């Protein structure tokens, strides 16, 4: 029997999208999953929508934060702490999976004895319209690789719970990137299935309007958090900037 997969979904004011997000999980061809949705004190009717699905499918579990955290990190950590699965997968409330996402990634990981896999993804409009804007990422990612690129799309990550252990998301800018660094620092390598398995909603709200702030955050992580030497940090930043430019013009 295929081991249980825990789907981790933070939600904040996602009433316009959360139903479609849940439906994309319900449509998975791999059916042995649990979906842990953690509402971060939404002020819209997100919780009401989520609870309507909880009543219909016992695989969906609902949690709430005690107070607004202002970051997906805390809701994700709550979900991880309560997860029962052998594998973890991450899906934000405004994104979607294609139906074979979990099955393909599980099969790929098992066939190759990989602990951590990810995939390419397609950008869609805020209204959910697909326009073939596929983002292809590197075929594998080591710690040294993502210092320069950060390219492990959170909505496509699929990893064995042994990778996570006691590690948790840090409430800070680029919290998913810092989490991948912590995991890959354990000499773990992540591998791309080289297929497109998820849909990323490319809305104005999801784009950073301050590219300078993004670069500053990247520098803080590489230079100060990871304590990479000054000149190699500059090299990493140059590569990161070039890759970021290519990403935002696609």
Spans of model-derived segments:
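A conserved hydrophobic helix/loop-capping motif in glycosyltransferases and polysaccharide synthases
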Residues: 5-17, 21, 28, 38
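Acidic helix N-cap motif at the loop->helix transition within catalytic regions
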Residues: 17-19, 44-52, 96, 100
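A conserved acidic beta->alpha catalytic loop
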Residues: 24, 39-48, 67-69, 92
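Glycine-rich, basic loop-to-helix element that forms the pyrophosphate-binding segment
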Residues: 65-83
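Conserved nucleotide-sugar donor-binding catalytic segment
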Residues: 81, 137-213
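Conserved donor NDP-sugar-binding/catalytic core segment of glycosyltransferases
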Residues: 100-131
């Amino acid at each position: 029997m295929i081991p249980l997969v825990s789907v981790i979904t933070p939600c904040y004011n996602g009433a316009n999208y959360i139903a479609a997000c849940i439906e994309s999980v319900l449509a998975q061809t791999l059916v042995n999953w649990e979906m842990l949705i953690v509402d971060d004190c939404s002020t819209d009717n997100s919780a009401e929508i989520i609870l309507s699905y909880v009543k219909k499918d016992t695989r969906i579990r609902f949690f709430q934060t005690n107070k607004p955290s202002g970051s997906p990190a805390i809701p994700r950590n709550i979900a991880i702490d309560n997860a029962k699965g052998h594998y973890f997968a991450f899906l934000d409330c405004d994104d979607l999976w294609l139906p074979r996402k979990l099955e393909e990634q599980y099969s790929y990981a098992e066939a190759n004895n990989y602990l951590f896999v990810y995939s390419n993804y397609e950008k869609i409009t805020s209204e959910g319209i697909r326009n073939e804007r596929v983002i292809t990422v590197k075929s594998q990612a080591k710690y040294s690789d993502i210092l320069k690129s950060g390219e492990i799309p959170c909505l496509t990550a699929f990893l064995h719970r042994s990778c996570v252990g006691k590690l948790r998301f840090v409430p800070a800018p680029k919290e998913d990137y810092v989490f991948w660094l912590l995991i890959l620092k354990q000499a773990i390598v992540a591998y791309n299935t080289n297929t497109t398995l998820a849909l990323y909603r490319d809305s104005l709200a999801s784009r950073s309007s301050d590219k300078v702030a993004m670069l500053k955050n990247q520098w803080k992580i590489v230079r100060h958090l990871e304590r990479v030497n000054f000149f190699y940090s500059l090299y990493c930043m140059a590569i990161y900037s070039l890759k970021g430019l290519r990403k935002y013009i696609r």
